[in-house]
From Swiss-Prot:
Cellular component, GO, one term: cytosol
UniProt note: pH dependence: Optimum pH is 4.5.
Assembly and interaction partners: Homotetramer.
Hydrolase in keyword set: yes
Provenance organism: Thermus thermophilus (strain ATCC 27634 / DSM 579 / HB8)
Alphabetized InterPro entries for the sequence: FL_hydrolase_MqnB, Nucleoside_phosphorylase_d, Nucleoside_phosphorylase_sf
Record-linked HAMAP family: MqnB
Protein name per UniProt: Futalosine hydrolase
Hydrolase keyword on record: yes
Family classification: Belongs to the PNP/UDP phosphorylase family. Futalosine hydrolase subfamily.
EC identifiers of the protein: 3.2.2.26
Annotated metabolic or biological route of this protein: Quinol/quinone metabolism; menaquinone biosynthesis
Length: 225
């Protein structure tokens, strides 16, 4: 059973199920999945996952949605899996490490600004769906110019930017949830002129990937014979 999450319902119009409400969030219950619309931004994404996981068992979770493409990154309209998220607006310009304390500590492992998604689940999905993997960058404030986007991409080695991924990845680590992230590139990061965006193509790529994921999940659950 998948817990599916997206920042907005705009990114999930293809999902069909029984509407329900969970605390402050709206969602759907369908075959092989529960879906929640988290709302935009880091706090919303982390709260939705943590609140749901506190009251319900979560086998695996997928955050999916649109993202901005950095120069040299994935093509517009392409869907990719995110293997690691960078929280680029936490701490100093160079991150938390110069300050000497982590954002998250699990045993001997300390995480500063980089948070991996579940590598096994991500690899499994990449092979099954035939998708590339990339490094994502998360900020509550998106890039407003191409120059700003390029500087962030170079500083952190990221291929795309969004507003939720690092919070989701960090919450998954803290809660022990196997998490994966799927993003489709709708626009060049830092370009606000929507004439250069490819939102329709990106939404179609998201729909294809999530539908295939759910179809394969259904096949895996179907008894032989």
């Amino acid at each position: 059973m998948w817990l599916l999450l997206s920042p907005t319902r705009l990114e999930a119009p293809f999902l069909e199920g029984e509407p329900f409400a969970f605390l402050a969030w709206r969602g759907l219950k369908g075959t092989g999945f529960v879906y929640l619309e988290t709302g935009i931004g880091k706090v919303n994404a982390a709260m939705a996952l943590a609140a749901y996981a506190a009251r319900n068992p979560v086998e695996k979770a997928l955050l999916f949605g649109l993202a901005g493409a950095y120069p040299g990154g994935p093509s517009l309209g392409e869907a990719v899996l995110v293997e690691e998220e960078v929280e680029a607006d936490l701490g100093l310009k160079e991150g938390l490490a110069p300050l000497g304390f982590p954002a998250l500590a699990l045993g001997e492992r300390r995480y500063f600004n980089r948070f991996p998604l579940d590598p096994g689940l991500t690899g499994e999905l990449a092979r099954g769906l035939g998708l590339k993997v990339a490094v994502g960058l998360t900020r509550d404030l998106v890039s407003e110019t191409p120059e700003e986007a390029l500087a962030l991409a170079r500083r952190w080695g990221a291929s795309l930017e969004n507003m939720e991924g690092a919070a989701f990845a960090r919450a998954c680590l803290a809660l022990g949830v196997r998490g994966a992230e799927l993003r489709a590139l709708s626009n060049p990061a830092g370009v606000r002129d929507k004439a250069h965006w490819r939102t329709k193509e990106a939404l179609s790529a998201l729909a294809r990937a999530v539908r295939r994921l759910l179809a394969e999940e259904g096949g895996a659950r179907r008894p032989p014979g």
